[in-house]
């Protein structure tokens, strides 16, 4: 790889570190090509990506970035799993690590916050952006449906009482 290619890789990695909601660093030694393809497919489905890069170039790309503290994790055969959604990459990495013991999560970064192994696990258990939006919408919609039910209830109660009175009158 010549100098121009290295500079391009550093620039691409820098953009990844700046634009990603979360970046997870893991060791992947011993994984087969099929297992790596499975990891990439899972990440793609979740809206994320997987990148294997030279640690030295990744460390250069981290210089001056908010997540620069993550540079200490870049040793050995490392892979970066990242996504704009702050939860997606962590969920993909955790799920893949449970299925593949050779995939060892080291930590990562979420914005300016460095994450250790437990931090990545905690982030993976959080609801995704879409799930949070759905929860908020249901919370906003619940009072309106309760009010509509309360307004409609007296009318249905009156109708029920009237039908009972009519039935009793007809029976007598």
UniProtKB/Swiss-Prot annotation:
The UniProt record lists the keyword Ribosomal protein: yes
GO-annotated cellular components: large ribosomal subunit
GO molecular function: large ribosomal subunit rRNA binding; structural constituent of ribosome
Superkingdom, taxonomy of origin: Bacteria
Keywords: Ribonucleoprotein, Ribosomal protein, RNA-binding, rRNA-binding
Pfam family, one: Ribosomal_L10
Record carries keyword Metal-binding: no
InterPro entries registered for this protein in UniProt: Ribosomal_uL10, Ribosomal_uL10-like_sf, Ribosomal_uL10_bac, Ribosomal_uL10_bac_type, Ribosomal_uL10_CS_bac
GO BP annotations, alphabetical order: translation
HAMAP family named among the record's database cross-references: Ribosomal_uL10 (MF_00362)
Assembly description: Part of the ribosomal stalk of the 50S ribosomal subunit. The N-terminus interacts with L11 and the large rRNA to form the base of the stalk. The C-terminus forms an elongated spine to which L12 dimers bind in a sequential fashion forming a multimeric L10(L12)X complex.
Function: Forms part of the ribosomal stalk, playing a central role in the interaction of the ribosome with GTP-bound translation factors.
Record PANTHER family: 39S RIBOSOMAL PROTEIN L10, MITOCHONDRIAL
Family designation: Belongs to the universal ribosomal protein uL10 family.
Name this polypeptide is given: Large ribosomal subunit protein uL10
Lineage: Bacteria, Pseudomonadati, Pseudomonadota, Alphaproteobacteria, Rhodobacterales
